[in-house]
Amino acid sequence: EAIEIDVEGIASHAGAHPQDGVSAVAIASLAISDLVENGWHGLIQKGRNTGASNIGFVSGGEATNVVMPNLKLKAEARSHDMKFRERIVKEIRKAFERAAKKLKNAAGQRGSVSFWSDLKYESFALSPKEESVQTARAAVESLGMEPELRICNGGLDANWMTAHGIPTVTLGCGQDGIHTVNERLYIDSFLQACAVGLKLATGQES
């Protein structure tokens, strides 16, 4: 679930009148610290429930001599359990709202938070008996490989296709260390995936 958060502080001169300002980045920092300390950022495990959240974009500020008046953040929440994903979103919202209430300037004024969330795709899991799963399994086995069924925590075209009535399998293609500086592609695995794709598309093996 995609999340956008606008934090509104109060601008003031950071040298002459810092007490008159409310820092938007200070509000966001308190909120993020709250989420981390209480286990609602990164990998989330609460009892039997699991999920993840991430704040991946932060933008704001005008100059070093201005108490930051506004800050925009973009985040996301994930879980294979719809209700738990909604809980994660709720906890993120509450953390930012609490943080905004904690800070005030010399005049007693506080900043504010605007919060939006939008479900980009729903999670899904296919039965091993699903026809598309059986077809993919057969293609892998026909090429002398052993299929391994896994649940993926990424967002895929398969999410949309399955949601629209087309049960869809995604095949591994040799990626490793995704979205890191160590990201790599194992060529042998990639070529195996190409062979499976060709088999599924044409019935041919080469």
Cite the ranges covered by each PLM segment.
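Metal-dependent amide/peptide-bond hydrolase catalytic core
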Residues: E4, I10, A14, Q19, ...
